[in-house]
Amino acid sequence: MRILGLDPGLRNTGWGIIDAVDNRLRHVADGVIRPDASAALAERLVQLHDGIMAVIADFSPDEAAVEETFVNMNPASTLKLGQARGVVLLVPAKSGLPVGEYAATLVKQSVVGTGRAAKEQVGMMVKTLLPGCLAATADAADALAVAICHAHHRGTQQKLARAVAR
């Protein structure tokens, strides 16, 4: 199972690809999509769309997972982030991928063991759980953490379904 993790943002959208087989995780790739900050909002959203489409085309994931965003004190920033998140949810869904959504606290809990972990702790645990991973940025590490969270929750859901079917 190849999973695309996405950490949405209008300035930087982190992405990470992992392979999850049974209980084993393997880092495939990661990076950041950086729309041109000087471009109009609509153009930045197009650049975000095109960047995610390129990642999907290059790595052929089976499923996607997106981190839910928190509401910020600045309504204008929250609205723009929501628009970017809409693109981040739409692209994999339009590509036929099932999309899971996870709260940041659940992602941190799944990867670090506490929902209040710092970004540095998340990055360190991602590198521990994915040997050989050198996550390019904190945004990429966060996206990989979202993918890891999805793999863990997906595996649990499959085990429950098998147990109920017996």
Curated annotation (Swiss-Prot):
Cofactor note: Binds 2 Mg(2+) ion per subunit.
EC number assigned by the record: 3.1.21.10
Classification via Gene3D superfamilies: Ribonuclease H-like superfamily/Ribonuclease H
Protein species of origin: Paramagnetospirillum magneticum (strain ATCC 700264 / AMB-1) (Magnetospirillum magneticum)
Protein name, entry field: Crossover junction endodeoxyribonuclease RuvC
Main location: cytoplasm
EC supergroup of this enzyme: hydrolase
SUPFAM superfamilies in the record: Ribonuclease H-like
Family to which this protein belongs: Belongs to the RuvC family.
